[in-house]
Design a protein with these regions (language model features):
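Multi-bladed beta-propeller domains
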Residues: 2-29, 59-82, 106-124, 152, ...
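Short, solvent-exposed loop/turn segments that connect beta-strands within catalytic domains
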Residues: 49-50, 135, 166-167
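Hydrophobic alpha-helical membrane-insertion signals
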Residues: 17-18, 22-59
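Conserved beta-propeller blade repeats
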Residues: 25-39, 73-93, 122-137, 146
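A flexible loop/linker signature enriched in serine peptidases of the S9 family
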Residues: 44-54, 74-80, 95-103, 118-125, ...
């Protein structure tokens, strides 16, 4: 290769492996990594699905699967920016759904429809953790509108939700 040969071309006419399409192509975002048993879990943000956030699982055998069927999307709006909005028990995934801020439960197999374990309310949930000793889900709860109609600021407190009967206590 002769490095002394110089070639001149007009601005913008050099061929490049980097195209505008390559730069602007939607790429998934990955965050909220957790390990559980022999599997890895993470949240995948999908721009090509309108920004839907899907909880993913990579099993010990290398199988990767979505755990949230459409239209469910993982996201919390507690403190306006959210927090860890999913937790794993031995058989179940608990997650906050973006559209209604309710906590849902679904099977770790990814089969079946998620079931809401909290009602429609002014409450938002984040930072979910499983308390295995007491069989409950602990979460930060943010209530908008407050218990008194004149309150402007959200009220924040911890809640415990029984994994056996889904009763919520403050």
């Amino acid at each position: 290769v002769n490095l002394n040969i110089k070639t001149q071309k007009a601005f913008g006419s050099w061929p490049s492996p980097i195209s505008a399409e390559l730069i602007t192509r939607a790429a998934p975002g990955l965050n909220c990594l957790q390990s559980h048993d022999d599997s890895l879990f993470w949240v995948e943000s999908r721009p090509w699905e309108g920004g839907r956030n899907v909880i993913m699982c990579r099993q010990a055998d290398g199988t990767i699967k979505d755990l949230l069927p459409k239209p469910y999307s993982h996201s919390s709006r507690v403190h306006e920016y959210g927090g860890m909005a999913y937790a794993l028990s031995d058989e179940s995934l608990y997650f906050v759904n973006a559209s209604d801020q309710r906590i849902y439960k679904t099977d770790l197999s990814g089969e079946g429809e998620p079931l809401a374990i909290t009602g429609l309310s002014l409450q938002r949930f984040a930072d979910l953790i499983i308390d295995r000793n007491n069989q409950r889900l602990i979460a930060v709860c943010e209530e908008h509108g407050g218990k008194n109609s004149g309150e402007q600021e959200p009220e924040n407190y911890l809640v415990a939700i029984s994994l056996n009967n889904e009763n919520l206590s403050v």
